């Protein structure tokens, strides 16, 4: 059996050495042989067992898996979503809508692997090839018809979706993130664009034309469908934002549709349109899709609302400058009282976005409490220094302990105020140093206000 984890090798297995971001499988070849590997596939070296040298083991693995499981792959429709923000909500809405329409659909992404309303936690937004194919086989056994995936820039850069072909791809937006991995914004853009070169000949490419980089994803070789407030295939004519819903008029060809989304936020209009267009691209009538609209909801940690007296507490995953700006602008459109924000930045990650997020939070909030997100192995004081280094306002304080920060934020609420707790969303853990402990923002809020 072909395996990429030396620890799982048993007698007679073939070990394939993959180079990752942190580790290189070539460093574990000897261990794999000791564990019983009878064959090694790698890019370099000489070993005491049968050895196949190939130019790129990741390319080899992708072709091997595609050839081996062609029957299973051909039974699915694949939908891939990429972008800085909105991937999870867009993909999760597609998962819900298609299942409500009677098309058995699985979801793979940030919040896990969903099939038959069961959830399995994942380590990465887009798993590696071996794990991905395990999920595909599980989907095949369960008669899944459509697989909707979040496709991250990491996955595209590292070849985790090599040789897959998509029936529908969608671009949500592009803003600063992951520069610690890609090195430059241009590299980040190039990584995202790779998904749009993986569309089947009869596939559909869905593009947010309002995004400043939208035109970079309009490839002539694709059948492009655009959406946005600007003139587009699916055009938003007007909208009205409320704390618990969003109303807007949608123009498609010569038809107009008045839509009431049971989820708030201007950005969720965009996320919903990705889901709507994906369903239509698979052959559903737009009016049939809209009939299911009352049945959808956002995933955990995406604008999770907790009512507290006359106030509203919102837990959200917003952890990039653009996501933070979008959620703050949205709540400012319907706030009646003050807006308080609790936010931090992850450690051992892109430092350049920290002062930007600090500026956005203090500009659009009445008051901000900066706190720990997942500091990991980075000094928490360094993270805070980066966040506040350019601030000349005094409408903020720093409370490193996240639970104490949430307690303080709740204590500030008076009447019809809004408290945003940003950055972690669905996560039920906090990483400090190398220790991962249970921590769930929503649980903490409910415990405090009970």
Annotated model-derived regions:
Residues 1-63, 67, 212, 235-239, ...:
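N-terminal leader/targeting and accessory segments in enzymes
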Residues 12, 37, 48-49, 102, ...:
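Short, well-ordered alpha-helix to beta-strand connector turns
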Residues 47-48, 112-115, 155-157, 212-216, ...:
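Short, active-site-adjacent cap segments at secondary-structure transitions
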Residues 61-209, 213-223, 279-280, 334-335:
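Phosphate-binding loop of NTP-binding sites
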Residues 38-44, 205-209, 342-343, 366-374:
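Short internal beta-strands
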Residues 33, 42-49, 142, 166-313, ...:
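Acidic, Mg2+-coordinating active-site environments of NTP-dependent enzymes
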Residues 8-14, 20-27, 277-287, 291-301, ...:
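ATP-dependent carboxylate-amine ligase
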Residues 44-45, 110-111, 153, 174, ...:
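Short, ordered loop/turn segments at secondary-structure junctions
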């Amino acid at each position: 059996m072909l395996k990429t984890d030396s620890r799982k090798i048993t007698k007679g297995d073939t070990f394939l050495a993959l180079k990752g971001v942190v580790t290189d499988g070539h460093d574990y070849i000897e261990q794999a042989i000791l564990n019983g590997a009878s064959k090694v596939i790698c890019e370099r070296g000489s070993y005491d067992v049968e050895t196949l040298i190939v130019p790129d083991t990741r390319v080899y693995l992708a072709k091997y898996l595609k050839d081996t499981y062609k029957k299973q792959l051909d039974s699915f429709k694949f939908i891939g979503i990429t972008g800085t923000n909105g991937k999870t909500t867009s993909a999760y809405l597609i998962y819900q809508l298609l299942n409500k329409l009677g098309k058995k659909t699985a979801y793979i992404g940030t919040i896990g692997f969903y099939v038959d309303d069961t959830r399995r936690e994942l380590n990465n937004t887009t798993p590696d090839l071996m794990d991905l194919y395990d999920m595909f086989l599980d989907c095949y056994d369960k008669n899944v018809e459509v697989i909707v995936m979040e496709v991250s820039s990491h996955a595209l850069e590292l070849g985790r979706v090599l040789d897959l072909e998509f029936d529908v791809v969608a671009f949500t937006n592009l803003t600063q993130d992951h520069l610690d991995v890609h090195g430059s914004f241009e590299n980040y853009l190039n990584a995202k664009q790779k998904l749009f070169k993986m569309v089947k000949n009869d596939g559909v490419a869905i593009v947010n034309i309002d995004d400043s980089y939208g035109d970079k994803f309009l490839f002539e070789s694709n059948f492009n469908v655009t959406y946005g407030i600007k003139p587009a295939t699916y055009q938003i004519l007007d909208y009205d934002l409320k704390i618990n819903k969003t109303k807007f008029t949608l123009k498609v060809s010569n038809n107009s549709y008045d839509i009431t989304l049971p989820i708030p936020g201007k950005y969720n209009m965009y996320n919903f349109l990705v889901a709507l267009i994906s369903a239509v691209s698979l052959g559903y009538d737009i009016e049939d899709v809209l009939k299911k609209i009352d049945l959808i909801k956002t995933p955990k940690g995406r604008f999770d609302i907790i009512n507290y007296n006359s106030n509203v507490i919102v837990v959200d995953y917003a952890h990039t400058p653009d996501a933070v700006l979008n959620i703050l602008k949205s709540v400012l459109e319907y706030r009646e009282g003050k807006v308080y924000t609790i936010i931090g930045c992850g450690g051992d990650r892109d430092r350049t976005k920290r002062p930007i997020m600090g500026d956005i939070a203090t500009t659009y909030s009445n008051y901000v409490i900066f706190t720990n997100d997942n500091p990991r192995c980075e000094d928490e004081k360094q993270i805070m220094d980066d966040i506040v280094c350019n601030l000349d306002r005094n409408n903020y304080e720093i409370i490193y302990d996240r639970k104490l920060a949430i307690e303080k934020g709740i204590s500030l609420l008076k009447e019809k105020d809004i408290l945003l707790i940003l950055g972690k969303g669905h996560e039920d853990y906090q990483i400090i140093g190398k220790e991962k402990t249970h921590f769930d923002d929503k649980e903490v809020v409910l415990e405090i206000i009970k």
